[in-house]
Amino acid sequence: MDPFRKAIKGYDHDRIPVWFMRQAGRYLPSYMKYRQRMGIEEMMSSPDVIVDVTHDPVDRIGVDAAIIFADITTPLSGMGLRVRFLDSVGPVVENNIEKSGISAVEEFDPSSFSHPVLKAISKYRERYADPLIGFAGGPVTLLSYIISDGVDRDLFRVKRMMITEEKAYQAVMTRLTDMIIEFARMQISAGVDAFQIFDSWAGYLSPGEYEHFVKPYVYDILQELSGSIPTIYFSTMTSSYVADMDLPADFYSIDWRIDMKRFSAEIPDEKGIQGNLDPAIVNYDYALHEASKIVEAASGRDRYIFNTGHGLLPSTDPEKLKRLVEYVHSVNL
């Protein structure tokens, strides 16, 4: 069994596994070759393109796992939502809640949902033996995309809905939660080895807001998936309360704002940790210094995966990233 599969399942392993969020992205020459002739939507509609872009970091960078090339808005079409990708903006939901009301957010029916990304997962599994990670956005993060034109990054509109339209908020969050569970099961059936939830904007919530308005839904997702696949929960800017989340995730993926040594001491030994290098420093020699500190701080844990604390930047130098991977792999356990 490879180091990633061993680490995420809690088995002994002889080297620290490494992968990066957004490793199949704009910093790679192979990705940019596709982008020169195809839009994002066209790329994500081709299983063969998805497989190629997904696997390239394994070959080029030497990471220990691939993450399927997709977007967190991918399954929203199965809820009756129309998503467009705009240059320099990203995904925009045309029939968002502010325009069309919560009735626009339909119940997700897995029996009628088909997407090229699911076929791509199956194709990837047929072609390659290395670990493959599936994913979905967290429910409140997805809500930030469907509530208005463009993403509500600071959750201003989401918070207004939480407080002034709580029943509507609960109805939408329940539908998103049900969809995420079903979409995860579809990815598991197609062949992914682990599943990560991206709650990128959770840090805009206070600890109390998260506990009351978000945690019950995230908890339900992770509980439903428990035992069927190793799970990773990623959030950013949550340093003040991530150790107290008490979620049934197998791993917490943390950002660079959290001290690894302190966090490791605060959570149960059976929980895994993933992270947490600042992606902005990857191109500099200083990244190796920071990586050594992170790895040393996590050295007492059996379940640890090296990663950045958020997605890689388009300016990332592939050769510098490869050097970082080689360095982490060289650390003696």
Swiss-Prot record:
One of its GO terms (biological process) is protoporphyrinogen IX biosynthetic process. Homodimer. SUPFAM superfamilies: UROD/MetE-like. The record marks 71 as: Transition state stabilizer. It is an enzyme of class 4 (lyase). Its main location: cytoplasm. The gene is hemE. Belongs to the uroporphyrinogen decarboxylase family. It catalyses: uroporphyrinogen III + 4 H(+) = coproporphyrinogen III + 4 CO2. Pfam families: URO-D. Gene3D superfamilies: 3.20.20.210. Keywords: Cytoplasm, Decarboxylase, Lyase, Porphyrin biosynthesis. Pathway: Porphyrin-containing compound metabolism; protoporphyrin-IX biosynthesis; coproporphyrinogen-III from 5-aminolevulinate: step 4/4. One of its GO terms (cellular component) is cytosol. Substrate binds at residues 22-26, 71, 145, 200, 310. It comes from Thermoplasma acidophilum (strain ATCC 25905 / DSM 1728 / JCM 9062 / NBRC 15155 / AMRC-C165). It is found in: Cytoplasm. This is Uroporphyrinogen decarboxylase. GO terms for molecular function: uroporphyrinogen decarboxylase activity. CDD domains: URO-D. Catalyzes the decarboxylation of four acetate groups of uroporphyrinogen-III to yield coproporphyrinogen-III. Its EC number is 4.1.1.37.
